[in-house]
A protein has these predicted regions:
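Amphipathic alpha-helical assembly/interaction segments
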Residues: 1-104
Length: 104
């Protein structure tokens, strides 16, 4: 999604930040899913959501600096919003599961 050559980003700086945030989203999901406790998973889901917010900000900056055309920007933001909704839904589910486990 973000590593295609169609994006005309500077070689360093913003590009590295965008890549880091983009990779952090699934990396935090995977690390959290591998944890033993729901509370730990919830923590990594929160980190993943934070990385998504960071990525959104960086994409806005890239767009305003003219590195992303409006069509590409809109597509990426739309995909990122969907990812955010999925993470939010998973966070709610994990929170409910954690509450049920604590009630036992």
């Amino acid at each position: 999604m973000l590593f295609r050559s169609e994006l005309k980003l500077p070689r360093y700086g913003l590009t590295g930040q965008i890549r880091h945030a983009a990779v952090s989203i699934p990396a935090n999901l995977a690390e959290g899913a591998g944890r033993r406790w729901q509370k730990e998973f919830a923590h990594f889901l929160s980190n993943s959501q934070g990385s998504a917010s960071e990525l959104e900000t960086e994409l806005i900056i890239a767009n305003r600096l003219g590195y992303l055309d409006e069509t590409t920007f809109a597509r990426l933001i739309s995909q990122l919003e969907r990812i955010g909704r999925l993470i939010t839904g998973l966070s709610r589910h994990v929170g409910r599961e954690s509450s049920i486990a604590n009630a036992r």
